[in-house]
Amino acid sequence: MRTSCPRSNTNGGQTVCVCNAKDEKYTFNLSRCVSQEGIIGEAKKSIKVETRNSIHVECLDEIILDHAVKNSSEWFGKSMDRVTVQRMYKPILNNKSWRVRVPIDDVTGSFNGGVFNNNNDRINIDDVRLETEMFDAVIQLVGIYFIPGEFGLSWKLLQVKVHPRTLLCAYAFNSDEDDTSDAEPN
């Protein structure tokens, strides 16, 4: 993975672009996730997606921390040790909440990614109701943001695949008799 020099962004802060060895954006796939955020579209500027790929995410956090320590003079204006850099870094997954916040629109306010249903047909993002559906998301790491006393990763939502949520409306367990007949005694 390579990182660029810090550049001023439109918000007045600084951003570092992140590229992999082939000079392509790093793409990260999330496992199936559910959100309680409501409707995707104009009413919501971002969604929260849960991930079960915590090992891969923690590895990416370590790579980012390594780069931050190595480039601390350029990124922060002075050389810093790993402990100091780690205190400033906002990890991808918060310990309290295993979620990643991903904006769904770009600067123009429109979503340019693809939204697909279970049949792989393109659908309108305004028709997605997160309270009744599950989805897979493909997100892309697009840079590192810096604000006073903190830095973290910036993400872009590339695609969403919507799945109907399966609700259990009837008894879902096997018969108790079947379960106990195969069990071994303690």
Where are each of the predicted segments found?
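Basic, polyanion-binding surface patches
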Residues: 147, 160-186
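Extended serine/threonine-enriched, polar tracts that run as long, contiguous segments within proteins
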Residues: 90-165
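OB-fold ssDNA-binding interfaces and closely related basic DNA-contact patches used
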Residues: 1-106
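Short non-domain terminal segments
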Residues: 26, 114, 169-171
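Short coil/turn segments at secondary-structure boundaries
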Residues: 31, 150-153, 169-172
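A sequence-composition feature that detects small, non-aromatic residues
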Residues: 21, 43, 68, 137, ...
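Low-complexity, compositionally biased segments
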Residues: 64, 84, 108, 177-185
